[in-house]
Structures are given as C-alpha cells and as structure tokens.
Amino acid sequence: MFIAILDFQTAAADRPAALAQLETERGQIRAMPGNLAFRVYASREDDSTVTVVHEWQDEESFKPYLASEAFIRSGEVLRPMMTGSPVSRRFHAELLETVA
C-alpha cells in the first residue's frame, strides 16, 4: 500500500473554497485504478490548515494521479490560495488487518 499525506494552509476565508475544490475532484480520484481512499480534513487546531490523505494500492497506481486532470485542476485552483508551501509525505505501508 502507498499512502500520501498532504498538508497546506490557506487564509481562513479561503479554506471553504479549498475544501470545496478537493470535494469536487473526489469522485474522479476515487474512480482511478488503484485508489483505495481520498479523504479531506479541515484542521480542528486552526482555521487555515487542510489535510488530504490518499491511500493507493501501490506507488505505481499513484503516479498517474500526479499527471491527471484532477491533480492539475486542483493545483491551479489551490496554489494561489496557499499561504505557504504544501508539504507532501509519502509512505509505503503494509496493512496488517482491518478491524470492523
């Protein structure tokens, strides 16, 4: 499994628009081969941070996302709203179990 976590900040007034943009792209991203999850979170610690958590089958299935129209569109909309550089952390992970 491949996990990518993206954190970025916007002005407080821009965060709803940033969240809306990511929600707009969610369906297309979830439909991509190998995507297991795409979750967007507004920080409870402040009014400017947004976190996106991606889960993919593997790193190879993540790569087409980086070249996708959804990624490009979101970048065009989100980057001007960002008040600093985004931070993307990427992990290889092994699922041990799913407990329901």
Which ranges hold each PLM region?
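An amphipathic, aromatic/His-enriched active-site/gating alpha helix that lines ligand/cofactor pockets
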Residues: T24-L36, E55-S88
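Intrinsically disordered, low-complexity acidic/polar segments
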Residues: R15-A17, T49, S61, E97
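Non-catalytic surface loops within mature trypsin-like serine protease
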Residues: T10-A12, D58, H92-L95
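Glycine-rich beta-strand-turn "strand-cap" elements at beta-sheet edges
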Residues: R39-S48, E76-A100
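Short, well-ordered beta-strand segments in beta-rich or mixed alpha/beta enzyme
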Residues: F2-Q9, R39-L66
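Short, surface-exposed ligand-recognition loops at beta-strand->loop->(often short) alpha-helix junctions
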Residues: Q9-L19
